[in-house]
Amino acid sequence: MAGPAMLVAAALALCLLLASPGLAWYKPTAGQGYYSVGRAAGLLSGFHRSPYARRSEPRGGTRSLGGVGTFREMRPNLRSLAVCVEEVTPNLQSCEPLPDGRATFQCKADVFLSLSASDCRK
């Protein structure tokens, strides 16, 4: 005669085999399909833009007076230019410690940029 433990195990196995499968215990959310972890997450998983970021320039018939309309027309061209940092001169008198508890300071600086590709050095 089989022991009571063997009968209970057989009955449990039979119930599990005959029962219909239930819902999945884990369903991924409908949100983002990637999770950024650590500092190199953008390099490892590619660059992902926010779905709320503006993808193109707004189209509108409103034009500002003065030279602002000319600047808006030039702006797509400025995005394709190479920007090179020529020189950074920090103003040490403006440095203030940040309240993060580490030895981190915030300083003002003069930054000289160049829009010429010939000025870019590697």
Swiss-Prot record:
Location comes to: Secreted
Any GO molecular function = G protein-coupled receptor binding
Classification via Pfam families: NPBW
Maturation-removed propeptide residues:
56-122
Residue positions of the PTM 6'-bromotryptophan?
25
Q: Give a GO cellular-component term.
A: extracellular region
Signal peptide position in this chain?
1-24
Key words, A-Z: Bromination, Cleavage on pair of basic residues, Neuropeptide, Secreted, Signal
Biological process GO terms, please?
feeding behavior; G protein-coupled receptor signaling pathway; neuropeptide signaling pathway
Record protein name field:
Neuropeptide B
Q: Which organism is it from?
A: Bos taurus
What gene is behind this protein?
Answer: NPB
